[in-house]
């Protein structure tokens, strides 16, 4: 009966308290019953359960083998913690990581738990498996209020962890000022090194902790490197911690010059150096001038080393340009509170800002001397070549042919062997001396061109940073004009110099024109790399299509109204962010990523030429599109043209191909290349043939009575539109017919769609600068935007006709097709463009190629062979005029020269 009553009482208590009132006998089961109560600090319940139990309060459980005392200390359950201690819990028991309850209380800032643990003899000097004591944990988290209590129980405030780090090390690293002061007040060793030789100051600088570094220096901390020679300043600069560098310089002024010299260290990231020097320069005008003067001196020293042929070109070139870039960056930033461009310089004199460039004048003077010397030698060699030519002519008795020989052309092979002996025996020695001098000059150019070009690049950067944005320095323009011949000699000898050092051409249209013919002669691939290198310069993200961090940067478009919704969103988007990356999501769909971006561009490229928007019309060949002169029927047509330009610019910026091809004339408009009468064929082939007829025939006695005006339909009424002022009264004659053809071409191809072109270019240039896109011609621009189409050579052969004496079985024709089969896909496209004016095969293959009067098969016509003759073409009739070359090798060489050099209208090379 008594036992039954006891069970009933236990049942009642359990139901009232909604828990068990007895612990299981098994420790593993019991501990998981107690743990939630300990975490909630339900000390009465824990006490009741423990009172009638044999539970081991030091029982370790779980993966990390902690006791309930660890749990209480970790959670701040002070009442349960005291209860467990009274029940005999061990305050110094270590879990699997070596942590005691005191470690956990210190880490989490449980002050009351720490106090009780210390009362029950918790050992503050116990280290965990990493060598950390409780004092380390307090230092890591900046628990200064607890540290005061704990240090009274610590026997050694400089106790080290496994890496030899004291609490002061970690407090300095984490920037806890009051903790650092407390440790120092408690006797911590301010210069104590860890196993790597790193002091607390080293640790403070490694994380840019300005305030803790200042406390240490104020209290006499020594400036010491670690065992590898890395100094606190090195760490500050590596991290870009300008404020901490400033503190170091305040206590150790000699470090200022060290920072300037660090610009030569290629292992240091340039952007970190910029951050440091930018911060220092903004503190005062005097410091700003001091930094710039120091950088100018270092740049001058490095520049002269670069001009020394015994130095390493690659290393010195990179060093010079790096220093100059930093110099220009700091110069543009300037101090926060400039003193009207003047302040006391570090030498005690009033120093205008322009004076910081003075040390560099020595380098520019050396550069000028080098270029003048080379120019002199080049001129001397030209004179020597003229002397050699004169000698040869006299020896051969051919003075009457002198007018046929170039004054600057050196003698050809075998010239010296044909010289007579006897009285003129010494002549070859004279000529040999002159040839050796010429060879020496060329050798000098070979070894100096890259070095001098790198210094020229540095000179341009320094000139530019003194000019307003968008303006070219008159001094630099004068410099290039003065040394024009030598610079062209450099790039002719080594065209790669353009891409390596002549970046100024992209920013100076007035100079670009001088070198454009050389640039255009460079391989398409090299120009593409140069294009994208400068297009993306300054952009932080190398992965061009990525998911932006912010949801606001995602272009959310509606699939059922993709053109209009995309137009609205792109017009409002931040252009700078769009240049860095694009993320697109279709409304109601989860998909994102590069595949969605590609789909977006593909759909939009089709929508741009959708007839519903009336923006573009199909050309005569049915494969390309031209701006619609009647697009005004759509009230928003100019906004849409601007959007079309943005889409093509974005696609080019992000290397995304568009599924659309335009007429050759429209690509010319994008490039700023004037159109010609042949471009008219894309919209009116018959009219183009008429213009061709006028040019090909004498119109003097035909009585055409044409004037410099045309009749055009303006809203249903015929009006006379002058091609130039007073054109209605100016007759077209044999002498001015070329001007007439050009003006009427411009009317049809440009003036009629000028507003549309302007709107398109406004959008396109938001992402693609005009100076960059001019690196290409209209054929190359098409490849950049739309990619390279596949060409079926068998279909090409099947649908080719032969004329003027050629037949399919002729050796020249067989050689031709063998060469075509061996061509790369790019070269085949160039051949197709060369002959037809288009890089695409129309739907249905070569059988559907259009000419000026309708369907016109690809045709190969025979031309009599003369040495060096190049193939030519007539694009209006898709005809390749192929000379009857004597061998396959010559045919291949001449054909590739024509394709890569663009022999449109030229027949010799």
Curated annotation (Swiss-Prot):
One of its GO terms (molecular function) is ubiquitin protein ligase activity. Keywords: ANK repeat, Cell cycle, Cytoplasm, Endoplasmic reticulum, Golgi apparatus, Membrane, Repeat, Transcription, Transcription regulation, Transferase, Ubl conjugation, Ubl conjugation pathway. E3 ubiquitin-protein ligase involved in Golgi membrane fusion and regulation of small GTPases. Acts as a regulator of Golgi membrane dynamics during the cell cycle: recruited to Golgi membrane by Rab proteins and regulates postmitotic Golgi membrane fusion. Acts by mediating ubiquitination during mitotic Golgi disassembly, ubiquitination serving as a signal for Golgi reassembly later, after cell division. Specifically binds GTP-bound RAC1, mediating ubiquitination and subsequent degradation of active RAC1, thereby playing a role in host defense against pathogens. Residues 1-21 are annotated as: N-terminal helix important for homodimerization. PANTHER family: E3 UBIQUITIN-PROTEIN LIGASE HACE1 (PTHR11254:SF363), HECT DOMAIN UBIQUITIN-PROTEIN LIGASE (PTHR11254). ANK repeats lie at residues 23-55, 64-93, 97-126, 130-159, 163-192, 196-226, 228-253. It comes from the Eukaryota. Its EC number is 2.3.2.26. It comes from Rattus norvegicus. This is E3 ubiquitin-protein ligase HACE1.
């Amino acid at each position: 009966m008594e036992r039954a009553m006891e069970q009933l009482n236990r049942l009642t208590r359990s139901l009232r308290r909604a828990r068990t009132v007895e612990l299981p006998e098994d420790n593993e089961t019991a501990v998981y019953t107690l743990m939630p109560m300990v975490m909630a600090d339900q000390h009465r319940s824990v006490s009741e359960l423990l009172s009638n139990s044999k539970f081991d309060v030091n029982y370790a459980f779980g993966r990390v083998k902690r006791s309930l005392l660890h749990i209480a200390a970790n959670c701040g359950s002070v009442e349960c913690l005291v209860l467990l201690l009274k029940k005999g819990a061990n305050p110094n028991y270590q879990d699997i990581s070596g942590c005691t309850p005191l470690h956990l209380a210190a880490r989490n800032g449980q002050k009351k738990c720490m106090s009780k643990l210390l009362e029950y003899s918790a050992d503050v000097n116990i280290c965990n498996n990493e060598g950390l004591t409780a004092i380390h944990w307090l230092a890591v988290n900046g628990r200064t209020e607890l540290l005061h209590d704990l240090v009274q129980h610590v026997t050694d405030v400089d106790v080290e962890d496994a890496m030899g780090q004291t609490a002061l090390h970690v407090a300095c690293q984490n920037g806890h000022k009051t903790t650092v002061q407390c440790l120092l007040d408690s006797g911590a060793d301010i210069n104590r090194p860890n196993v790597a030789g790193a002091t607390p100051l080293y640790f403070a600088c490694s994380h840019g902790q300005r305030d803790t570094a200042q406390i240490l220096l104020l209290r006499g901390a020594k400036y010491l490197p670690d065992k590898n020679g890395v100094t606190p300043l090195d760490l500050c600069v590596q991290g870009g911690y300008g404020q901490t560098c400033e503190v170091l310089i305040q206590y150790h002024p000699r470090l200022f010059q060290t920072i300037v010299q660090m610009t030569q260290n290629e292992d240091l990231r340039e952007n970190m150096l910029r951050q440091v020097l930018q911060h220092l320069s903004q503190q005062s005008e005097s410091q700003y001038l001091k930094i710039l003067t120091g950088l100018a001196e270092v740049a001058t020293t490095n520049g002269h080393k670069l001009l020394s042929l015994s130095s390493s070109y690659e290393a010195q070139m990179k060093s010079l340009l790096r220093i100059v870039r930093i110099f220009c960056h700091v110069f543009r930033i300037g101090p926060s509170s400039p003193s009207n461009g003047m302040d006391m310089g570090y030498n005690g004199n009033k120093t205008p800002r322009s004076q910081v460039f003075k040390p560099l004048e020595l380098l520019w003077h050396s550069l000028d001397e080098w270029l003048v010397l080379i120019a002199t030698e080049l001129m001397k060699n030209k004179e020597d070549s003229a002397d050699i030519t004169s000698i040869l002519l006299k020896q051969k008795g051919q003075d009457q042919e002198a007018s046929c020989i170039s004054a600057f052309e050196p003698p050809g092979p075998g010239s010296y062997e044909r010289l007579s002996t006897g009285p003129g025996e010494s002549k070859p020695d004279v000529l040999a001396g002159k040839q050796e001098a010429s060879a020496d000059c060329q050798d000098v150019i070979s070894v100096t061109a890259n070095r001098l070009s790198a210094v020229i690049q540095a000179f341009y950067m320094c000139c530019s940073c003194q000019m307003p944005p968008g303006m070219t320095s008159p001094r630099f323009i004068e410099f290039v004009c003065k040394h024009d011949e030598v610079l062209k000699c450099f790039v002719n000898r080594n065209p790669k110099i353009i891409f390596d050092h002549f970046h100024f051409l992209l920013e100076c249209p007035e100079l670009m024109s001088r070198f454009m013919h050389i640039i255009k002669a460079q391989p398409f691939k090299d120009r593409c790399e140069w294009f994208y290198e400068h297009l993306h310069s300054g952009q932080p993200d190398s992965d061009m299509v990525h998911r932006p961090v912010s949801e606001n940067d995602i272009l959310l478009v509606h699939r059922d109204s993709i053109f209009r919704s995309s137009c609205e969103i792109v017009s409002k988007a931040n252009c700078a962010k769009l240049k860095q990356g694009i993320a697109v999501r279709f409304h109601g769909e989860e998909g994102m990523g590069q595949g969605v971006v590609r789909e977006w561009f593909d759909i939009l490229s089709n929508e741009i030429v959708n007839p519903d928007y009336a923006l573009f019309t199909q050309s005569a060949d049915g494969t390309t599109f031209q701006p619609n002169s009647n697009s005004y029927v759509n009230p928003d047509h100019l906004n849409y043209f601007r959007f079309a330009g943005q889409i093509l610019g974005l696609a080019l910026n992000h290397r995304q191909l568009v599924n659309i091809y335009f007429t050759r004339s429209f690509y010319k408009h994008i490039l700023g290349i004037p159109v010609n009468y042949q471009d008219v064929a894309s919209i009116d082939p018959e009219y183009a043939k008429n213009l061709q007829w006028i040019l090909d025939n004498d119109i003097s006695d035909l009585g055409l009575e044409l004037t410099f005006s045309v009749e055009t339909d303006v809203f249903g009424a015929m009006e006379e539109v002058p091609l130039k002022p007073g054109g209605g009264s100016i007759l077209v004659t044999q002498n001015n017919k070329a001007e007439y053809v050009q003006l009427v071409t411009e009317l049809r191809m440009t003036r009629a769609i000028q507003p549309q072109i302007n709107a398109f270019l406004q959008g396109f240039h938001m992402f693609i600068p005009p100076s960059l896109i001019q690196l290409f011609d209209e054929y190359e621009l098409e490849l950049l935007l739309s990619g390279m189409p596949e060409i079926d050579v068998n279909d090409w052969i099947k649908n080719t006709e032969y004329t003027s004496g050629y037949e399919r079985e002729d050796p020249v024709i067989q050689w031709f097709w063998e060469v075509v089969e061996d061509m790369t896909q790019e070269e085949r496209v160039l051949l197709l463009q060369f002959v037809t004016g288009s890089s695409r095969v129309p739907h249905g293959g070569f059988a559907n190629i259009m000419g000026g009067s309708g369907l016109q098969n690809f045709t190969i016509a025979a031309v009599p062979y003369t040495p060096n003759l190049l193939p030519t073409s007539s694009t209006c009739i898709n005809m390749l005029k192929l000379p009857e070359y004597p061998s396959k090798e010559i045919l291949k060489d001449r054909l590739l020269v024509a394709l890569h050099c663009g022999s449109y209208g030229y027949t010799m090379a």
